């Protein structure tokens, strides 16, 4: 079975569903820390203006009181990759794939199934804070490494920021996907190409119930197809020819 790891995104699209969620002990530790910080503290940590810091301070207080706006994680995050993922009007098989095979790597919640209900927040692994005297990456490392203790194929659509949360040993188990555009023989890639292609690739995997690497290599999506010569056992490269 394939499991696909995707990152969170800064951009969010919030729906109004108020509830009192269950939170893990590690998530609660982070909430307890942030809920003690002042608006000024948050301005410095996030490097944002006072108005934005007030918004984040209120979010952390809402977390503390457990009066939260909850959304399925896959629908809450709304960055470029997410906007290229099919997230609405899923068939039964697509919804099952999303629930069982797609996981989001979060600095607040850990690794969670894509349909997990979560609340809007601002936190990533580059945030300069110490939780229990550890960086967020070290704080979550054991949890992330535990997720890798299975025989499933782990496909990474993560950036380096998220992959380095895993210990080097567990990181070696990840299968990376690379997306390149061929423009008149010139191979090019950049963040916009990669983010859009990650979303399109995940959609194709979901629509085709992709469960093996051989099946993944056969997929065609948004003009991309697998290139064996540019790939190896740990990195699958997909190329899109542009005229």
Swiss-Prot record:
Q: A single GO CC term, please?
A: cytosol
InterPro entries attached to this UniProt entry? YaaA
Q: Which Pfam families match?
A: H2O2_YaaD
Any one biological process term the GO annotation gives: response to hydroperoxide
Top-level taxon: Bacteria
Q: Which NCBIfam families match?
A: PRK02101.1-4
PANTHER family attached to this UniProt entry = PEROXIDE STRESS RESISTANCE PROTEIN YAAA, PEROXIDE STRESS RESPONSE PROTEIN YAAA
What family does the entry list?
Belongs to the UPF0246 family.
Q: What is this protein called?
A: UPF0246 protein SAK_2020
Annotated organism of origin? Streptococcus agalactiae serotype Ia (strain ATCC 27591 / A909 / CDC SS700)
